[in-house]
């Protein structure tokens, strides 16, 4: 949740709460998805659906429709106030990642979404029902998982040619290609509190070190020492 807030993808309510168990509407998720795609979502056609015209979320809904992320109910409506299901959100995320959205339409679309979402890890840690309303907390989980997936640049290619690649020819995650963030994972062996590798040692204030990695300009507390943690840094 904190990462998505820091990236400007989500926010809480005016009373300072987040309401993690509350359902997410289709209109609300369209805004999140649009921001996941770009900092400045725009749409050429602002009349994609009759039931969103004039609403606060119309721009985001139309932006997503133009990108093939959402398709409505087939009757010209989007049902913006309905709750979005986990499977519907997964479908949107797959298209954002660059997968061919036409695969997720028609008969059996849900099975194809589930197969791809499971394969990529989008459902990792999710214990709810895929066809039920997804909570705000679980929506954050699915979005976070999707951002760790490879960014597809050519859905018709095979193998590594499908993905954006780094200098070592490894697939870049969507998080890296969109936000420039790279994840480093390892055991936290030293910070400003102590150094597990040197008796009485410690790092400068605001520094942390993972085993097998250089020092990072990131603060961490004593309780994290010796534990496996993730550190996210801007690439370059």
State each model region's role.
Residues 136, 225-226:
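Short, flexible surface segments
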Residues 235-236:
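OB-fold/S1-family single-stranded nucleic acid-binding modules
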């Amino acid at each position: 949740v904190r990462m998505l807030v820091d990236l400007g993808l989500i926010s809480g309510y005016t009373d300072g709460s987040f309401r993690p168990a509350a359902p997410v509407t289709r209109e609300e998720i369209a805004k999140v998805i649009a921001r996941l795609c770009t900092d400045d979502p725009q749409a050429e056609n602002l009349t994609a659906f009759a039931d969103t015209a004039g609403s606060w979320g119309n721009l985001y809904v139309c932006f997503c429709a133009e990108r093939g992320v959402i398709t409505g109910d087939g009757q010209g409506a989007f049902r913006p106030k309905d709750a979005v299901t986990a499977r519907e959100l997964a479908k949107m995320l797959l298209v954002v990642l660059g997968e061919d959205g036409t695969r997720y339409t028609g008969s059996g679309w849900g099975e194809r979404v589930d197969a791809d979402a499971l394969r990529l890890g989008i459902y990792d840690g999710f214990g709810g029902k895929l066809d039920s309303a997804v909570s705000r907390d679980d929506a954050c989980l699915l979005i976070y998982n999707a951002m760790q997936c490879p960014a597809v640049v050519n859905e018709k290619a095979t193998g590594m040619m499908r993905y954006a690649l780094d200098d070592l020819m490894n697939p870049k995650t969507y998080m890296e290609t969109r936000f420039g963030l790279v994840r480093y994972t390892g055991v936290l062996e030293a910070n400003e509190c102590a150094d597990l590798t040197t008796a009485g040692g410690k790092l400068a204030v605001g520094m942390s070190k993972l085993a097998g990695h250089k020092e990072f300009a990131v603060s961490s507390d004593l309780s994290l020492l010796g534990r496996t943690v993730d550190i996210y840094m801007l690439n370059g």
